[in-house]
Amino acid sequence: MRCKVQLYLCGKVFDEIVEARDYQDAKRTALARNPTAKVIGVTAVFG
């Protein structure tokens, strides 16, 4: 499924769209792309 992961880094909040199996996988993928960021939230994206 496609997930939107909200990340926080250096005072900014930004979204990372990832293809993942579940929410934990989405978090891992987003953190692999942005290792120093903090995950704020994960939501499924449809459409």
Language model segments and positions:
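Short, mixed-charge low-complexity intrinsically disordered segments
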Residues: A32-G47
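Generic detection of short hydrophobic beta-strand segments and adjacent strand-loop junctions
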Residues: E16-V18
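Compositionally biased, intrinsically disordered low-complexity segments
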Residues: Y8, R21, V42-V45
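Short aromatic-glycine-(Arg/Gly/Cys) micro-motifs in beta-strand/loop hairpins
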Residues: M1-F14
